[in-house]
């Protein structure tokens, strides 16, 4: 069982039980105690669970329909997101004002920024999760777009956000997407996010697309831009040779 599936199973079990012991989980999932402890650390840092003596319980604030929640989506292909985030750090160099979108992949990138020794930057975001993560972090000057909070999707949206972004000068944007279509369109399923990203493509001097290899040839409801409009695409090493050959004709590819 891959780590992402195992963590989902842990959350499902917690939905059915008020408390789960670490040794009990290790036995049921047929993995070592060390592996379970590592899973618990990731889920705890995501805000999904609380660690208590001898085990864990579901975080009451995330006890709703967690299958659709942002922090559960973050667990999908989590190792790929971390790989992509670490590669993306080098592209912060000489950039003063950065936009970070509200995707789970970019949230992982934000975590890497906050835990690194990069110089202080102006970070602009429409992500409530990134705002919370940035509390008491010394190397960022964080600017929120404000707007209407859509908790289920971890997004500040609405016309206010677009109007706010129109007045900014952005050196670089780091974004993700629901999928890349067969025509190499960058797509999303969220109307608010589509409008925001369309504005970002107009305003940012440089677009960095952070997207894992499972998203290629997956098509969302709304097209935002073509992949050639990105300065670079940063993905994981499991990208197919076919997709790789196509992308390098359109933009810089970082693997």
What are the language-model segments listed below?
Residues 81-89, 106-107, 162, 194:
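Short, well-ordered alpha-helical scaffold segments within catalytic/effector domains
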Residues 2, 76, 80, 101, ...:
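Short, well-structured alpha-helical patches and their helix-loop capping segments
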Residues 5-12, 19-25, 30-32, 44-45, ...:
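Conserved phosphate- and dinucleotide-binding cores of soluble alpha/beta proteins
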Residues 113-114, 221:
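Distinct, well-ordered alpha-helical segments
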Residues 95-110:
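Conserved H-X4-D acyltransferase segment
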Residues 2-5, 9, 15-23, 28, ...:
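HTH-adjacent hinge/linker in prokaryotic transcriptional regulators
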């Amino acid at each position: 069982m891959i780590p992402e599936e195992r963590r989902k199973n842990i959350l499902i079990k917690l939905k059915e039980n008020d408390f789960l012991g670490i040794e009990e989980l290790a036995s049921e999932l047929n993995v070592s105690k060390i592996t379970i402890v590592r899973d618990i650390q990731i889920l705890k840092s995501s805000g999904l669970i609380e660690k208590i003596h001898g085990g864990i319980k579901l975080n009451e604030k995330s006890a709703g329909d967690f299958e659709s929640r942002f922090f559960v989506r973050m667990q999908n292909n989590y190792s790929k997101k971390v790989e992509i985030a670490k590669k993306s750090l080098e592209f912060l160099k000489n950039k003063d004002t950065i936009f970070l979108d509200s995707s789970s992949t970019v949230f992982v990138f934000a975590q890497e920024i906050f835990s690194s020794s990069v110089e202080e930057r102006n970070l602009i975001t429409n992500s409530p999760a990134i705002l919370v993560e940035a509390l008491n972090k010394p190397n960022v000057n964080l600017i929120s777009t404000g707007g209407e909070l859509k908790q289920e999707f971890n997004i500040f949206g609405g016309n206010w956000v677009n109007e706010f972004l129109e007045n900014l000068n952005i050196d670089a944007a780091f974004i993700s997407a629901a999928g890349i279509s067969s025509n190499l369109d960058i797509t999303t399923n969220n109307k608010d996010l589509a409008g925001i990203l369309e504005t970002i493509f107009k305003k940012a001097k440089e677009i960095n697309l952070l997207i894992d290899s499972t998203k290629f040839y997956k098509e969302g409801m709304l097209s935002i831009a073509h992949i050639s409009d990105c300065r670079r695409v940063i993905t994981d090493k499991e990208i197919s040779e076919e997709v790789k050959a196509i992308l390098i004709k359109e933009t810089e590819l970082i693997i």
